């Protein structure tokens, strides 16, 4: 028995030393995340199209609460969550309970200054779009976790996101942070910036022009792309109606019977609003493709530059009559 116990002890001290060391550390250390600022998105001239706004997240640590009613009263006064919801979270026995995110920095600072035991206020970042709906279908937006959902925000998420940091604090057996023990901090790594070929001024003018056409023609939507033909750079990409990037879950059109529609129908309406039709749909090229067919005909020797044609306003192909946009025809061309 003694030999067995010695062998078991040696096994635990040598083979399982790292495991039990980590387990012991986990019992008296608490880790808090430090959010990394997301990379900015710029236009070609250095104008910021997507930025970060400092906000706060508010949590409670149950083991540190000295007066539950005081905690509930403070949070109810400063946060728009409702007393019943706040009370439910404050009285819940957990190591750390998140109460609210995206709290205005001024509000977070006010709560922190009250120094109520059990309430923790951490710095966070919220995505902010200074031009509202401008280029919304191109830029896309982020979710509550600051991760990209649609558009360039999700396409370049790994570049923009950065790496979160952390704060490690030492606690006693009850989970209360020890006041005189230095905390260990791992700094966050900010995300990389993204510079687009878009030109803010051209994008604004293109958006105004598209909105004017939509109103004049009573169209459901109007799309426009302005491109440099020499290198393919896109200076403007518009798909109106756009939506407010700072309130992406607010529909930009009326949905009949919105209160009675299903969640699935609401989600379909939102997805349709977020969709960039300039790149997600296919369209008949129309007259822009005439240069291709004309060049092919000249190259094949089917026609020459001196040939003329008569346009009666339609063309018979097999059993179909394909009409010209000018139904009376262009005559001799």
Model-derived features: positions:
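Residue-level signature of the cytosolic catalytic core of signaling kinases
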Residues: 148, 198, 275, 281, ...
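Surface-exposed acidic, glycine/proline-enriched linker/cap segments
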Residues: 252-280
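Active/ligand-binding-proximal structured segments within catalytic/core domains
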Residues: 286-294
């Amino acid at each position: 028995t003694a030999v067995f116990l010695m062998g078991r002890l040696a096994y635990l001290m040598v083979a399982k030393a790292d495991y039990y060391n980590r387990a012991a550390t986990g019992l008296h250390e608490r880790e808090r995340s430090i959010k990394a600022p997301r990379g900015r998105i710029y236009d070609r001239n250095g104008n910021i199209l997507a930025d970060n706004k400092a906000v706060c997240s508010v949590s409670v640590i149950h083991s540190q609460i000295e007066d539950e009613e005081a905690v509930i009263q403070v949070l109810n006064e400063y946060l728009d969550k409702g007393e019943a919801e706040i009370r439910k979270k404050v009285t819940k026995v957990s190591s750390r309970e998140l109460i609210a995110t995206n709290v205005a920095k001024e509000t977070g600072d006010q709560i922190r200054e009250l120094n109520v035991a059990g309430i923790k206020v951490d710095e966070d970042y919220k995505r902010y779009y200074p031009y509202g709906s401008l280029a919304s279908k191109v830029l896309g937006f982020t979710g509550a976790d600051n991760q990209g959902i649609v558009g360039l925000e999700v396409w370049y998420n790994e570049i923009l996101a950065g790496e979160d940091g952390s704060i490690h604090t030492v606690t006693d057996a009850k989970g209360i942070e020890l006041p005189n023990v230095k905390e260990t901090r791992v700094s966050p790594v900010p995300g990389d910036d993204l510079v687009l070929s878009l030109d803010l001024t051209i994008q604004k003018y293109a958006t105004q022009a598209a909105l004017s056409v939509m109103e004049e023609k009573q169209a459901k939507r109007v799309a426009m792309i302005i491109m440099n033909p020499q290198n393919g750079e896109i200076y403007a990409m518009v798909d109106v109606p756009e939506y407010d990037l700072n309130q992406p879950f607010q529909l930009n059109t009326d949905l009949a019977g919105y209160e009675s529609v299903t969640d699935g129908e609401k989600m379909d309406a939102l997805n349709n609003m977020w969709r960039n039709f300039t790149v997600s749909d296919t369209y008949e090229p129309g007259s822009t493709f005439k240069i291709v067919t004309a060049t092919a005909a000249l190259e094949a020797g089917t026609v020459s530059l001196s040939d003329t044609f008569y346009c009666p306003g339609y063309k018979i192909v097999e059993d179909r009559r394909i009409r010209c946009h000018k139904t009376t025809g262009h005559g001799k061309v």
